[in-house]
Amino acid sequence: MDSATGALALEDGTIFAGFGAGAAGIKVGELCFNTAITGYQEILTDPSYASQLVLFTFPHIGNVGANAEDHEESTVEAADAARGAIFREPITAPSNWRSTEDFGVWLARRGIIGLSGIDTRALTKRIREKGMPKAAICHKPDGKIDFDALVELARSWNGLDGADLADVVDQDAPFEHTEGLWQAATGHQTALANAEFHVAVIDFGVKKNILRNLASAGARATVVNGNVSAEEVLALKPDGIVFANGPGDPAATFERSGEMIKTLVASGLPILGICLGHQLLGLALGAKTKKMAQGHHGANHPVKDLATGKVEIVSMNHGFTVDPDTLPPGVEESHRSLFDGTNSGLAVKGKPIISVQHHPEASPGPQDSFYLFTRFAGLMRDYRAK
């Protein structure tokens, strides 16, 4: 394409030329696709997407613009989330009462490279059939693109296997969170100072809406990073512990934080694990994790609650999964993906533990699993009553 100002190069040498948007430059990452129709701002600011390039299957991106409220990173350290965004059509002009910024301008300000004019259906099919490749994306406004160099960059990148990316996006210093869920009439609610519970959130790249859901469930959250010791966490005297979401290979993060997680599990305190936190809990309980071929990324994934038989439509964003064949005695699957049968939740006999692979906080996505935060509050209430 002679007029191309952007391109995507895969590690196998395949090149997709198109039109650059957002930030100029070159970045490498793992290419995945996301099937959500809306919520692109939340997706691209989710720290779980660190070192990834997101291909949107929905063709029109940008129609609700961007704003200062719908970002999901909780700290400055977590701002380096997705590196690139690929879409079929040029960025759509914003038309939404909450929009304060054009999406292309927002991409540039965030340092995210955009690429349009791509056959996203063909690229999505390729990922489904061959898995998530290493890739390089570029935006060159002058059109001077070295395609061979892009391919070499993609091939030489280390990839996500063995990468402890949670250590990149978690915050350095502890902080308190009291902001609740957003309401159309009042904006974000503020949790009362006399919140019923105090929760310690272990930050591996925590999404802001997890913290908001905790606040709305009556919990004041103290957020600490994954390098703290179990003794430091227990010194906070929490009523419960949350192992948060995050990016990268769970086995690599477990090498750094595993002993802390095992000790906290042994403490008997109520625990909620989400996404990477769920995988880390699985490792702490004796299971193993494995890399997925194309992962789960979207806001329309059906999972089944194996205890009730209820089917929930949930948001998912992960490229690794707990291997259910490695679960030790006393640990059972609680939820399962109805797309491919992979694990989406764990339950532990005799312990107040809720652990799910999907994102009950949504943002973006359906609210079918919001009840898990209320259930977690119930576990803390029961534990306190002992």
From Swiss-Prot:
Small subunit of the glutamine-dependent carbamoyl phosphate synthetase (CPSase). CPSase catalyzes the formation of carbamoyl phosphate from the ammonia moiety of glutamine, carbonate, and phosphate donated by ATP, constituting the first step of 2 biosynthetic pathways, one leading to arginine and/or urea and the other to pyrimidine nucleotides. The small subunit (glutamine amidotransferase) binds and cleaves glutamine to supply the large subunit with the substrate ammonia. Residues 1-194 are annotated as: CPSase. SMART domains: CPSase_sm_chain (SM01097). The keyword Membrane does not apply. The gene is carA. Pathway: Amino-acid biosynthesis; L-arginine biosynthesis; carbamoyl phosphate from bicarbonate: step 1/1; Pyrimidine metabolism; UMP biosynthesis via de novo pathway; (S)-dihydroorotate from bicarbonate: step 1/3. Its EC number is 6.3.5.5. This is Carbamoyl phosphate synthase small chain. One of its GO terms (biological process) is glutamine metabolic process. It is an enzyme of class 6 (ligase). Signal peptide: none annotated. Composed of two chains; the small (or glutamine) chain promotes the hydrolysis of glutamine to ammonia, which is used by the large (or ammonia) chain to synthesize carbamoyl phosphate. Tetramer of heterodimers (alpha,beta)4. It catalyses: hydrogencarbonate + L-glutamine + 2 ATP + H2O = carbamoyl phosphate + L-glutamate + 2 ADP + phosphate + 2 H(+). The active site is at C275, H359, E361. Residues 198-386 form the Glutamine amidotransferase type-1 domain.
